[in-house]
């Protein structure tokens, strides 16, 4: 199996709802299945990134409820881990009522583990005098430990699969953009079918999102009233914002993710798709460009981390979309790809991530706009040069510099944001 297929298998999958609370639900479901008894308590411990992303986002199939705690309770009661990131498709009114009771009675809780810097979800479920535990680490579905009544069923020394252990990331991290483009030669008809499924899935949720009076609605209204042109940039922004609106509002429709993120999947897939269709690019070329978009998104997150203090839609998916557009028009022209990457990162590389929520659609719009603009400039031989700011000589060097900023320069950003968010919670009535 190639690096491309490892990336797709691990990071590009359908997800019903925001991927962090859904991963919490999945972990709870894993533990509850092993428990084999009626669930009495659910205790989840999560890293700052998962805590932040599940803080204010609406969870599907809950009637508008928000947060990791309802996701944990509902996932444990569903107890169908085979559904993975579509775990909440197994919810119904009866299970929701039971989950709400677990939460309101204090028998379902979520704790923050501040010292964890990677994706980490640890869920303990009790019932009938028994205790079961499931731990996910380094990926939304990467199981590293399963226990029941103190008996270890799986541990980190025996990963579920080579792909789940994310060994491919060490290889991907060292690749060049030219080498990633070379991976597109590995695509077969089955890969193209899967990529097209992602397009169709994300288009469907975008159409549902257009029924909401949220960000996508107002971008569309700006076009209708003449404030924005009715062009490919505006139509792309309406499409991506509407899809994000639907997802953040908890509408019960799956989205094809990228880099383990639904919003990143929306940008990485729909932007190159819509631009390609506008310019009558052959469908296979569009699909191959989307594959490249996924690879670039995964590559950048290998450097910055899965849940960095900076917005993944901006510095990962937006970059992937820009590269995809250049690839559609100019093929593997590395000079133009370097220009596109450097330009979009210089533009929106400092966009903060303050958790998943309705406002993410605004960042999706900004990322969409910046990706198309950067690609257009690059295709015309213009862009930000190494003489400016933290931009490097190449796409790879710029991403390395961005990684340094995210890791060292913004080390206190997440702590500060979490403090603010926790203070808000403590003052809620």
Swiss-Prot record:
From what superkingdom does this record's organism come? Bacteria
The GO biological-process annotations, alphabetized, read as: L-cysteine catabolic process to pyruvate
Q: Name one GO molecular function term.
A: L-cysteine desulfhydrase activity
Which protein family is named in the record? Belongs to the UPF0597 family.
Q: Mind telling me which HAMAP family this protein's record contains?
A: UPF0597 (MF_01845)
| Annotated protein name in UniProt | UPF0597 protein GSU1527
Organism field: Geobacter sulfurreducens (strain ATCC 51573 / DSM 12127 / PCA)
The top of its lineage is:
Bacteria, Pseudomonadati, Thermodesulfobacteriota, Desulfuromonadia, Geobacterales
């Amino acid at each position: 199996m190639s690096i491309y297929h490892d990336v797709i298998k691990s990071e590009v999958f359908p997800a019903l709802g925001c991927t962090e609370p859904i991963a919490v639900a999945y972990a709870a479901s894993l533990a509850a299945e092993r428990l084999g008894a009626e669930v009495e308590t659910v205790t989840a411990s999560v890293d700052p990134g998962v805590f932040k992303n599940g803080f204010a986002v609406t969870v599907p199939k809950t009637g508008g409820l928000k947060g990791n705690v309802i996701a944990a309770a509902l996932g444990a009661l569903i107890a169908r881990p085979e559904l993975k990131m579509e775990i909440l498709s197994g919810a119904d009114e009866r299970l929701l009522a039971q989950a709400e009771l677990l939460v309101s009675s204090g028998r379902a809780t979520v704790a923050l583990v501040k010292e964890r810097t990677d994706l980490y979800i640890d869920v303990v479920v009790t019932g009938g005098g028994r205790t079961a535990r499931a731990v996910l680490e380094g990926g939304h579905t990467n199981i590293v430990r399963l226990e029941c009544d103190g008996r270890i069923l799986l541990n980190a020394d025996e990963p579920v699969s080579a792909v789940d252990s994310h060994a491919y990331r060490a290889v991907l991290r060292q690749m060049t953009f030219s080498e990633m483009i070379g991976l597109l030669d590995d695509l077969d008809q089955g890969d193209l079918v899967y990529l097209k499924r992602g397009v169709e899935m994300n288009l469907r949720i975008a159409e549902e999102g257009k029924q909401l009076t949220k960000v996508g609605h107002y971008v569309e209204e700006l076009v209708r009233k003449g404030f924005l042109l009715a062009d490919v940039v505006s139509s792309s922004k309406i499409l991506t914002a509407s899809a994000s609106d639907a997802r953040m509002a908890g509408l019960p429709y799956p989205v094809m993710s990228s880099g383990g993120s639904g919003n990143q999947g929306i940008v990485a897939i729909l932007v190159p798709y819509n631009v390609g269709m506008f310019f009558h690019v052959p469908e296979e070329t569009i699909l191959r460009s989307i594959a490249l978009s996924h690879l670039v998104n995964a590559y950048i997150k290998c450097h910055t981390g899965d849940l960095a203090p900076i917005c993944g839609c901006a510095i990962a998916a937006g970059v992937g979309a820009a590269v995809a557009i250049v690839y559609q028009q100019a093929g593997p022209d590395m000079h133009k790809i370097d220009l596109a990457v450097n330009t979009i990162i210089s533009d929106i590389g400092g966009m903060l991530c303050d958790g998943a929520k309705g406002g993410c659609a605004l960042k999706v719009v900004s990322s969409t706009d910046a990706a198309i603009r950067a690609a257009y400039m690059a295709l015309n031989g213009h862009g930000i040069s190494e003489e400016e700011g933290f931009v490097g000589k190449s796409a790879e060097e710029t991403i390395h510099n961005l990684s340094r900023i995210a890791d060292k320069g913004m080390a206190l950003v997440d702590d500060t944001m979490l403090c603010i968010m926790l203070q808000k919670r403590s003052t809620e009535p």
